A protein has these predicted regions:
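Generic structural signal for beta-strand residues in well-ordered domains
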Residues: 7-9, 44, 66
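A structured beta-alpha segment of the ubiquitous adenosine-cofactor-binding alpha/beta core
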Residues: 19-64
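Adenosine-phosphate binding glycine-rich loop
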Residues: 66-178
Length: 178
């Protein structure tokens, strides 16, 4: 794939529509009209509502976590927030949606495809999206509830793990294995 934009950061006060033909024509967002070239470090530290690190690991570290101004960090890359940064962000009231939760959509849709292929089902695209939205929202709400229930003592990542363990334990009980 084309990785030219991995180390490129741009800021634009107004909405920046990357679906624009510019990316297609130039194969990069570099030089996007009206966008200001900034460092990746500056991008991470912008005063924004939601920050979505989506390309590289270890972007938010123990060193820069205290400078993150976003209210929410949604990890679309694998491991963009380091273990050292996670508690710092939580302490600073930055809600981190961990990669294992934020990235679960792709695996979930793969499961839907498996179900359809195995049992000969066909779901329209809209129905697939509705099922995915329900599962993702439920997973987020269960995780966030676990986080709030243990407020101050755990991170959202820990809450995600705790919900997963609870889910497995419940499945073991239902199957009569325990």
């Amino acid at each position: 794939g084309d990785h030219r934009d991995l180390h490129t950061a741009y800021r634009r006060q107004r909405q920046m529509c990357i679906r624009d033909s510019y990316k297609t024509e130039h194969h990069t967002v570099k030089g996007f009209p009206g966008a200001q070239d900034i460092s990746n470090e500056a991008l991470l530290e912008l005063d924004v509502d939601i920050l979505v690190p989506a390309a590289l690991q270890a972007q938010i570290t123990g060193e820069n976590a205290s400078r993150i101004k976003a209210k929410v960090v949604t990890e679309l890359a694998n491991g963009p927030v380091t273990p050292e940064a996670d508690p710092i962000l939580t302490q600073n009231n930055v809600l981190v949606v961990p990669d294992i939760l934020a990235n679960a959509g792709g695996v979930t849709v793969s499961y839907f495809e498996w179900i359809q292929n195995t049992y000969g089902y066909y779901w329209a695209e809209e129905e697939t999206y509705e099922k995915l939205e329900k599962i993702m929202k439920d997973a987020f709400h269960r995780t966030h509830e676990m986080f709030k229930k243990n407020e101050g003592g755990i991170t959202m990542r820990m809450a995600t793990d705790m919900v997963a363990v609870e889910h497995v334990a419940e499945a073991i009980k239902v199957k009569g294995w325990a």
